[in-house]
Amino acid sequence: MSLSTEAKAQIIAEFGRDANDSGSSEVQVALLTAQINHLQGHFSEHKKDHHSRRGLLRMVSQRRKLLDYLKRKNVTSYTALIGRLGLRR
């Protein structure tokens, strides 16, 4: 259920500060968003997979925490990121 190495590298290159930046909040939020979108497709086929749904809820919660942190520390980066990812806020 995880993302491929190529997909992760592409996300890191797009949202990171450099090619090796996998730990910044922006990259972590982008990776979590990609994983969440991937799992949503899984749940359209497997409606009773409650174990994976718990993992999805943990990812959504972690993304929310990272977005709250980013909003507190750097509002311009926060607004740019949610615009690029197409999140609701």
UniProtKB/Swiss-Prot annotation:
GO cellular component: cytosolic small ribosomal subunit
Biological process, per Gene Ontology: translation
Pfam families: Ribosomal_S15
Alphabetized UniProt keyword annotations: Ribonucleoprotein, Ribosomal protein, RNA-binding, rRNA-binding
SMART domains, A to Z: Ribosomal_S15
InterPro entries the record matches: Ribosomal_uS15 (IPR000589), Ribosomal_uS15_bac-type (IPR005290), uS15_NS1_RNA-bd_sf (IPR009068)
MF-aspect GO terms: rRNA binding; structural constituent of ribosome
Top-rank taxon: Bacteria
HAMAP family per UniProt: Ribosomal_uS15_B
Family membership: Belongs to the universal ribosomal protein uS15 family.
Function: One of the primary rRNA binding proteins, it binds directly to 16S rRNA where it helps nucleate assembly of the platform of the 30S subunit by binding and bridging several RNA helices of the 16S rRNA.
Subunit structure comment from the entry: Part of the 30S ribosomal subunit. Forms a bridge to the 50S subunit in the 70S ribosome, contacting the 23S rRNA.
Annotated protein name in UniProt: Small ribosomal subunit protein uS15
Source species: Photorhabdus luminescens (Xenorhabdus luminescens)
Gene: rpsO
